[in-house]
């Protein structure tokens, strides 16, 4: 939740335009809720996908029938889709508690259904992609690694945990003509939108 003063600071001169859009969307959907089998859903969301959303089993070790990995091709090419982060090998060793000398000491073992790193071996120690993302401050657990001198370069796709609705994907879907109901039902599999 953001206060009006926080929104004014964030949006600057565009505050009135954006605020009216938000207000219009809220009023148009007033009283509507998303449900799955008669129960309210946990409407998780994140910034930008890598082209697919993620199943929460890989992120938080739980599952929900409406939070399945789905295609989100609309994110490809958006401003937060790709990023790189360069980390000195010495810093990587310290943050992960390993002792590697080169990128050859890093091996991606498996990927998730959403195309992110599931299991990775770094200096003989096994990590999940989510752990590496959190420990190294990466935008996403969909990453590749390369070496540049005494640094490891992580190239990521997407931004966030990847579970639920992609904000940038939803925005691009809206620009392509999808309505809010179609967008929500795409990202939250099998839900109904009910007026309460």
Feature-to-residue mapping (PLM):
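Conserved, single-site charged/polar hotspot
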Residues: 1-196
């Amino acid at each position: 939740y953001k206060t009006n003063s926080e929104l004014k600071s964030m949006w600057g001169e565009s505050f009135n335009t954006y605020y009216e859009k938000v207000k219009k969307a809220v009023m148009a959907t007033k009283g509507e809720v998303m449900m799955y089998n008669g129960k309210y859903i946990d409407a998780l969301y994140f910034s930008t996908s890598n082209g697919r959303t993620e199943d929460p089993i890989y992120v938080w070790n739980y599952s929900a029938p409406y939070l399945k990995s789905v295609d989100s091709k609309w994110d490809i090419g958006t401003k937060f889709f790709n990023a790189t982060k360069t980390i000195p090998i010495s810093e990587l060793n310290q943050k992960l508690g390993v002792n590697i000398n080169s990128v050859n000491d890093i091996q991606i073992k498996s990927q998730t259904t959403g195309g992110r790193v599931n299991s990775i071996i770094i200096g003989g120690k096994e990590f999940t992609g989510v752990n590496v993302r959190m420990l190294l401050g990466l935008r996403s657990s969909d990453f590749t690694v390369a070496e540049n001198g005494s640094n490891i370069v992580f190239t990521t796709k997407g931004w966030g945990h990847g579970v639920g609705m992609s904000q940038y994907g939803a925005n691009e879907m809206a620009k392509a003509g999808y309505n809010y109901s179609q967008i929500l039902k795409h990202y939250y599999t099998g839900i109904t939108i009910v007026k309460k």
